[in-house]
Swiss-Prot record:
Cofactor(s) recorded in Swiss-Prot or TrEMBL: Zn(2+)
Coiled-coil segments on the chain, per record: none
Official protein name in the record: Ribonuclease P protein component 4
Subunit structure comment from the entry: Consists of a catalytic RNA component and at least 4-5 protein subunits.
Catalytic reaction annotation: Endonucleolytic cleavage of RNA, removing 5'-extranucleotides from tRNA precursor
A GO biological process held by the record: tRNA 5'-leader removal
């Protein structure tokens, strides 16, 4: 399992400079499915789910409690809900 995590981290890093980043991200997802590993949330936010390309210069906006990430390659918009971390203080 440790080898699989190292391989996933290597693939996400190499996808930023690779000539074929779709292949790197596809391999990363296949390894995580085969080994039953949930990808880290930070890793999932580094690439577009539709075109499997790492974000190069995404347009990021905040709107109505969501973070909108617009992919510069395929034009897909990803919506991520902003978590409310306010905890009521004890009285």
């Amino acid at each position: 399992m440790n080898i699989a995590l190292k391989r996933i981290n290597y693939l996400i890093n190499i996808s930023r400079v690779s000539d074929n980043p779709e292949r790197c991200i596809d391999l990363m997802e296949k390894i995580s499915k085969r080994m039953d590993i949930t990808l880290n949330h930070d890793i999932k936010l580094q690439y577009c789910k539709v075109c499997k390309m790492p974000y190069r210069n995404p347009v990021i906006r905040l709107k109505n409690g969501f973070v909108l990430i617009h992919c510069d390659h395929c034009g897909n918009t990803r919506r991520i809900k902003i978590r409310d971390h306010s905890v009521s203080s004890s009285k």
